[in-house]
């Protein structure tokens, strides 16, 4: 089985969940949860749950967090054969605050180690990247590294923009991206079209297709998402779900899209399977639902 190369961040996520409505500048009783995360690592974890072989191209520090990350990846079967070790640097760390519904309200990320993932790192590993079935990347990499990948990969490149700020790295690379998974503000920045409803989401997605992206999956959160390709546009409503927490849904969606693409699914079916994976994820208090599987996703999809 050909592996999927996942390129991006691997960090420790510390989440704070208030029991009631979050009060700014006040003490909030709640629960604090520490977990291994990072968009790249989470996508890789979800892909393993879906039964795919995965190699994670990331940077790890020389601290206890890095050792915990390595042990977790070993147990999950996520390959770290091409990961960069930086002994005197902190492993990437991400702290976020959720509201009473579990939705993230704000976050602070210490991701300086990701700057070590420079073009030279990828040039040394280009053969391994191009030996993959496809490459799924987040935008925690330096802009010049994303450009290097986009211009030198010979396999499809799937990209999760991750944030508005990091989305700016993609503005000149859109014609080189196979599949893009932006949320509303990321799509607005990249397309130049305000997304206020389903019709404007369609226009933004079509604009991204016109700019050269082959497939766009534009997430509108709890409403669902819009999928677009050159000759097709599909609206995929969010499935019924008992929402526990929404953090991690985008990573599950990204993983399911890559998995579905490699299954040979069409745009509409990719959208349905992606929505199914996201729904399964938000029904668990963990960022990654251990109950996610190919069978569960197929069973849940319409």
What label would you give each PLM region?
Residues 1-6, 167, 198-302:
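Conserved phosphate-binding/catalytic region of the ribokinase-like
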Residues 15, 107, 190-192, 228, ...:
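Residues that scaffold the ATP/ADP-binding catalytic core of kinase and kinase-like folds
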Residues 24-29, 49-133, 298-302:
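Conserved N-terminal subdomain of the carbohydrate kinase-like
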Residues 47, 183, 250:
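Short, conserved phosphate/pyrophosphate- and ester-handling motifs at nucleotide-, phospho-/glycolipid
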Residues 134-203, 223-225:
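Conserved beta-alpha-beta core of the PfkB/ribokinase-like small-molecule kinase fold
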